């Protein structure tokens, strides 16, 4: 599948329609978060349409009524796999969900980059920094070794964000 600008724009539209009525951080339309994740990728010089399309769709299986198969049919296997790999598994609580999800994310280097962009956006713009700080060692331990070298700057940035949190 060719990841064109047109397909990226279609992914944004699908995401906007699918997330309609949802909010981010209880006050913003959900597309703010989607756009934040896209901007994080661009800031770290990750500008391929494949990654930007996956960013536009990264929460669509988890939070909306779109299935893996629908994502695959319209956006291709690679995009569907990335989105699936960052989609939380079922669990009794957040800790169990993450414990089940992180190995799946770690199996796909592009999904790791996508998850890093998601986490950076959540820490920079969301109100849940304490929760993410508590999870950070397990999160990094599960994903760091399989992270492409080109994305190590994203880990450095996360380290800095959480260091600042300790000061404040």
Task: Give names to the regions the model predicted.
Residues 1-168:
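Active-site helical microenvironments for divalent-metal-assisted chemistry
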